[in-house]
């Protein structure tokens, strides 16, 4: 059977099914509402029947959410590969952050610098990670983020420091300023209030703090009892997300209280969760280094595997405002960009590259697009 014809039949069947549910529920509501508004009891309807109906409706609603999500999201839709700007002489990219203007910030294993790229992957700026002074010393940033005021902040695990880059310096090219000491800083992010978030890997903690204009730390707070926290990111509804090595991914609210773990809420078994982020719609996305996957955890419905192939060692993870998913693939020494929605959800989105475009070569249709 022709695939297009078969797909049309499936679409018609799905639409008829959903429409039948809508019509039946509307009809039942119209008949039941005036009867239930009179306080004369429930007729012959038993408590058990109400419970059964409630459970069935709950299941149907969950199934409809899953259908909606599966229609809305794509899997393994790789549209671009950005080579590691540090070249093959360094380790693969590990930390990644995408700013509101679409700029991409990248750190790599064993590379003493932060690369700032355009959304197309072209290098815009290079920030060498060097402490200027009598004896200039390079350091290796583990992860990177951008503060609300636009300053680049990194975690320096080797020197147990958090550093912020300041353009207002006595040095013509700016300088890195140490703003705090952490036992083993690994991941770094910014919460909804503008505070910097840092994971303390060996201590099992996440520290949050604000900075004043003189780079003085204010309003410190610590979340403890985590198991090897790796990456941290702004979460949905103003909270934050943190991944635990060989463990789970946990969501905290803006009062630093645990809301839930993804493993418990969704019944999902992680291998080695690494990069985490939330998209503009409030969905949570998690890279799994061991399983070489990326999963999306929707607000309602079951988890969806967005990337199930083509990753060697996914570490850092971020979403762009244009609705693209960027994965730092340390094992493949590049950044991989996926289009995970069926169509742009916002009119302000930048044009997306379509793998179905007739202008693409066969190599590009498979998802590999050299820059």
Where are these regions (language model features)?
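Beta-propeller domains
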Residues: 106-130
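Short loop/turn segments that connect beta-strands within beta-propeller blades
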Residues: 118-122, 166-170, 210-214, 253-257, ...
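A short beta-strand motif characteristic of beta-propeller blades
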Residues: 78-87, 123-135, 171-179, 215-223, ...
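Blade-level signature of beta-propeller repeat domains, shared across WD40, Kelch, NHL, RCC1
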Residues: 314-371
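Beta-rich, blade/repeat-based domains predominating
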Residues: 87-99, 133-147, 180-195, 224-239, ...
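Conserved beta-strand positions in repeat-built beta-propeller and related beta-rich domains
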Residues: 106-110, 146-147, 154-158, 196-203, ...
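Protein-protein interaction scaffold domains that mediate dimerization/oligomerization
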Residues: 1-82, 90, 97, 211-212, ...
């Amino acid at each position: 059977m022709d695939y297009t014809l078969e797909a049309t039949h499936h679409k018609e069947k799905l639409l008829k099914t959903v429409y039948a549910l809508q019509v039946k529920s509307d009809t039942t509501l119209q008949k039941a509402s005036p009867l239930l508004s009179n306080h004369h009891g429930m007729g012959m309807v038993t408590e058990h029947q109400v419970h059964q109906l409630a459970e069935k409706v709950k299941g149907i609603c969950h199934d409809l959410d899953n259908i909606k999500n599966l229609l809305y999201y794509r899997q393994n839709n790789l549209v671009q590969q950005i080579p590691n700007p540090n070249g093959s002489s360094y380790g693969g990219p590990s930390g990644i952050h995408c700013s509101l203007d679409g700029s991409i910030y990248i750190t790599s294993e064993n590379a003493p610098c932060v690369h700032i790229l355009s959304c197309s992957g072209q290098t815009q700026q290079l920030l060498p990670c060097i402490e200027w002074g009598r004896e200039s010393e390079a350091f290796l940033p583990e992860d990177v983020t951008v503060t609300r005021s636009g300053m680049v902040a990194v975690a320096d695990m080797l020197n147990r420091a958090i550093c912020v880059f300041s353009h207002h310096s006595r040095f013509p090219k700016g300088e890195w300023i140490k703003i705090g000491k952490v036992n083993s800083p690994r991941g770094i992010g910014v919460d909804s209030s503008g505070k910097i978030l840092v994971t303390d890997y060996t201590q099992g903690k996440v520290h949050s703090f604000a900075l004043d204009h003189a780079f003085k730390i204010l309003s410190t707070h610590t979340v403890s009892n985590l198991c090897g926290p790796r990456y941290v990111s702004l979460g949905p509804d103003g909270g934050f997300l943190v991944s635990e090595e060989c463990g789970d991914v946990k969501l905290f609210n803006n009062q630093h209280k645990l809301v839930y773990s993804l493993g418990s809420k969704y019944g999902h078994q992680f291998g080695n969760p690494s990069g985490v982020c939330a998209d503009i719609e409030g969905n949570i996305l998690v890279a799994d280094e061991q399983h070489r996957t990326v999963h999306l955890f929707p607000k309602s419905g079951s988890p969806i595997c967005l990337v199930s192939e083509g990753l060697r060692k996914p570490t850092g993870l971020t979403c762009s405002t244009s609705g693209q998913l960027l994965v730092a693939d340390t094992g493949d020494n590049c950044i991989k960009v996926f289009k995970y929605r069926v169509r742009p959800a916002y009119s302000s989105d930048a044009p997306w590259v379509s793998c179905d475009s007739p202008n693409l070569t066969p190599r590009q249709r498979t998802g590999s697009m050299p820059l």
